[in-house]
Regions:
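Helical element adjacent to the flavin cofactor pocket in flavoenzyme catalytic cores
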Residues: 181-242
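N-terminal Rossmann-like FAD-binding beta1-loop-alpha1 element of flavoenzymes
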Residues: 9-38
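Rossmann-like flavin
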Residues: 111-181, 188-192
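Mid-domain catalytic core of redox enzymes
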Residues: 223-331, 342-343
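C-terminal structured subdomain/cap of oxidoreductase catalytic cores
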Residues: 214, 221-231, 236-261, 291, ...
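Conserved flavin/dinucleotide-binding core of flavoenzymes
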Residues: 2, 6, 318, 323-437
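Glycine-rich FAD pyrophosphate-binding loop
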Residues: 30-54
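Dinucleotide-binding Rossmann-like beta1-alpha1 core, especially the glycine-rich loop
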Residues: 55-134, 147, 160
Length: 437
């Protein structure tokens, strides 16, 4: 390794990690005229929501659906970029006893009415949630639901809601978080798929950053967040075989609170904060099945959530809206399963097989029809979500010019890439306040 070189430029902010949260923060900051450097140790942007090629198919690593009409779109528009997605209609349907149910025709009452006599009581609780009337944060979604019904199909459906949005089981997700999302958040009503793979969205954000004076460095491994007199002074990183010091007035980390604490040095953070890092965060896992068929399995352009499965939670056919993601004559699918448990250790092999069995149950002849492209288990240091909703940490750290972004510091009840966009903008605003003070 060559001798360390100091970068003379002093950035307003250096942002570690070009996943959804880091990109959102960098994009908003550059739109406000701040000098920003976004760095990532991978060879492309997108983090756990990027895309790659397998045998001519464009396959997504994690997230596939990009939400429209809220913060995510606002951030991209701020740097002159449009959200390049195609919106399916209907966006979301449910597979109940082998039949497709479209909830847009009647909402929760319509969806649950054919399953349980308690449908109106459950629906009333969603109305209460919109008014801010929520259960205690210690009761799980499963326990809360048992207060209204024991119907297995209803419980499977709610479990699969939890799995699809938060990569958690109903006995792991607080009911307060569940109802906050469906009662007060966007609840994923409008979304679309990018015809270039989800990577295309992140590449557009990176282009917007560069067009507005920001910089994006890939294959750059941050080794250390540097401190002086209790404040961040920048980062030390390795790029192209050289150790480089980046000076910055602020540091934002999308690496998750655990890795961030290691980069800054746990001895520089107080005991209370480190207790949260070690004991509050609860990473959530899922299993992603990418496969293709030459015969369409189901004629639905959006996402299908299942009501009769134990592990498989939802599925989407990407070629219904974006045929260019697959070679001619092929239909490309992604299905998601969530292990039991999701927030603690599990046996990968048996959980993968359980998800496949659910696919076989829902689609007759699945093994003969489907070409499995890959199966990816998102867990550990590369999880589906860095913390299950209800167990997030704050964006602030004990160091006044160091912040966390991403899905370990979401707003209560939120989930997915949209949650990262919301947090990214919020952190960017705090950085701006700090810089302008």
């Amino acid at each position: 390794m060559k001798k360390q070189q100091a970068v003379q430029d002093n950035y307003d902010a250096v942002i570690i990690g070009a996943g959804a949260g880091g990109l959102a923060t960098a994009t908003w900051l550059t739109s406000k005229g701040k000098r920003v450097l976004l760095v990532d140790d991978k060879d492309k942007v997108g983090g756990r929501a990027t895309s790659y090629q397998i045998e001519g198919f464009t396959v997504n690593e994690g997230a596939i659906a990009i939400e429209l009409g809220s913060t995510f779109e606002e951030i991209m528009n701020a740097v002159g970029m449009q959200v390049d997605v195609r919106e399916p209609s209907p966006a979301t349907v449910f597979m109940v006893d082998g039949k497709i149910v479209n909830p847009a025709k009647g909402g929760w009452g319509f969806l649950l009415g054919g399953m349980t006599k308690a449908a109106s009581k459950i629906g009333a609780k969603f109305a209460d949630a919109r008014k801010g009337e929520l259960p205690d944060g210690n009761i799980s979604t499963e326990a809360w639901l048992k207060g209204f019904t024991k119907n297995k199909t209803v419980h499977n459906l709610f479990r699969n809601f939890c799995a699809a949005i938060w990569a958690a089981n109903a006995d792991e997700l607080p009911a307060r978080a569940f109802l906050t999302y469906f009662g007060q958040k966007g609840a994923f009503k409008r979304f679309g798929f990018c015809p270039r793979g989800t990577l295309g969205i992140w590449q557009d954000m990176a282009t917007g950053i560069r067009n507005n004076g920001g910089e994006v460095w890939l294959n750059a491994q941050v080794q250390k967040i540097t401190l002086e007199n209790g404040k961040c002074t920048g980062v030390e990183l390795t790029k192209d075989g050289e150790s480089v010091f980046i000076q910055a007035s602020c540091v934002v980390s999308n690496a998750g609170p655990k890795i961030t604490s290691q980069l800054v040095g746990q001895h520089n953070l107080d005991a209370e904060y480190m207790t949260q890092v070690h004991h509050r965060l609860r990473p959530a896992a899922n299993i992603v099945y990418n496969f293709a068929t030459q015969e369409r399995l189901i004629d639905v352009p959006g996402l299908v959530t299942f009501a009769n499965t134990e592990y498989l939670c939802n599925l989407g056919e990407l070629t219904a809206t974006c045929p260019e993601l697959a070679p001619p004559g092929w239909y490309l699918y992604v299905a998601y399963a969530v292990p039991r448990p999701s927030l603690s250790d599990f046996a990968e092999k048996s959980q993968i097989e359980a998800g496949l069995n659910d696919l076989r149950q829902e689609f007759a002849g699945f093994d003969d029809k489907a070409k499995l492209l890959n199966i990816r288990v998102m867990r550990g240091e590369w999880p589906a979500q860095r913390s299950c909703s209800g167990y997030d940490m704050a964006i602030e750290t004990p160091i006044s010019n160091l912040w966390n972004v991403g899905d370990g510091v979401k707003e209560y009840g939120d989930g997915g890439t949209q949650a990262c966009a919301i947090v990214g903008k919020a952190v960017a605003e705090q950085v701006i306040d700090y810089l302008d003070a």
